[in-house]
């Protein structure tokens, strides 16, 4: 992971690098491992949230990005889809802000991405990763077109990300925390 930051493969150096960074964080913290899972992300199910929490130092504001993953239908014995029993079965995944290193903060990258996307798409429930504009420069107000990133490009980006060891370490750590909570 450190190598990707140092080689400027992660960051905000270009529209493609920003997309790569978002996909990296979505893989690392949301545990998305396939192109299909990434294609389920949308501007309406990935949202910025802030809430107040009590800490040893008192009240503090915690900012995060939350992803409300689609519920997986379980098949009943008769082969039909069972209904969701409880609302809390819908997985809610989170990426918290990185106050220790704001230059690697998932929330800041998400906010920057939104600012570079066409406003008309920010309420869409069928797209998240957009194709970069062909002729944009860093100072351009928009970096992305209204065209969704195609599957083959997503798969290519994802294959590079899945080669990073820390992706699996973070996902294992988060899974272990969830198991401890049960």
Regions found by a protein language model. Name each.
Residues 1-182:
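Extended, non-catalytic subsegments within catalytic or DNA/protein-binding/adaptor domains
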